[in-house]
Amino acid sequence: MRPTVALVVARGVRAMGYRTAAAATKPAAASATSAPATPAKKPAASSYWRKAASAASTASVSNATKKTPVAASSPAAEPIEADDMPQVDTSTVDQAPTFQYPEGAQSNVFQHMNQREIDWEQSFQGLGSQAFSKEAAQVLQAPLTVEDIEITPDGLLYLPEIKYRRVLNAAFGPGGWGLAPRSDTVVTDKIVTREYGLICEGRLVSVARGEQTYFNEDGVPTASEGCKSNAMMRCCKDLGVASELWEPKFIRKFKAQHCEEVWGTHVVNKRKKKLWKLKGETLAYPYQE
């Protein structure tokens, strides 16, 4: 049985469509197989972290600027009147307590504060400017007692150094006087000497040079302290302390009444020597009668 014309035409059209579709797919496949596949580009590390940081900063800014919505149903806060606010006493805020000076002592405090700027090595601040009070003068010029006076084996009368300090403390009070060096310490082969100034109540009252002998180099520090004590004794002469010890008549009278000169024998070399001592006392070592 022969096919009909319509059937033949339909078969031809169908075959033509298959050829057209195959021809269309072949160039695409050929281009895909001819060109190698290129991998997708990854973002650079710097751009990646830049984007991450940008996103984080954007999120933080958005969170910071985000406002919590207020419920529409909550009532609005009423303004507080100034009269209704609690009153706070601010009169004592940031105020340091004021120190009250004792009566008559404020001027002395500021006087001592100003002394920090005075160079006592060269200054003569207050020298002879004003007399001391009557009470201080009576203490300074009080007569000596017989029990306070000592005598050296060579026959020199003296007052122990601690007695001078007690007189100054009684007249001006502890801390009301002091000794200021006015020169460098000079050390010779046998003597240490230095000049000192006596300052009482913030003013210079006397200047004297002290001296002390020594026998070896190890005794220089002790001699320096003795030099200071000797200068204090000489400065106190201007204040009238133990002024009797500088009077020849008093010295002769005291030695005649309370002292005696005896022969002393050295306990080591047995040499004899005339020495002075107080009556009723014995000779000091290394001598004996």
Swiss-Prot record:
Localization (cell): Mitochondrion matrix, Mitochondrion nucleoid
Spans annotated as Disordered: 24-91
Range annotated as the organelle transit peptide: 1-20
GO annotation, biological process: interstrand cross-link repair; mitochondrial genome maintenance; recombinational repair
Residue stretches of biased makeup (Low complexity): 24-79
Keywords: DNA damage, DNA repair, DNA-binding, Mitochondrion, Mitochondrion nucleoid, Transit peptide
GO MF annotation list: DNA binding; single-stranded DNA binding
Gene Ontology terms: cellular component: mitochondrial chromosome; mitochondrial nucleoid
Primary location: mitochondrion
Record's function text: Performs an essential function in the repair of oxidatively damaged mtDNA that is required for the maintenance of the mitochondrial genome. Binds to DNA.
Family: Belongs to the MGM101 family.
Protein name: Mitochondrial genome maintenance protein MGM101
Organism of derivation: Yarrowia lipolytica (strain CLIB 122 / E 150)
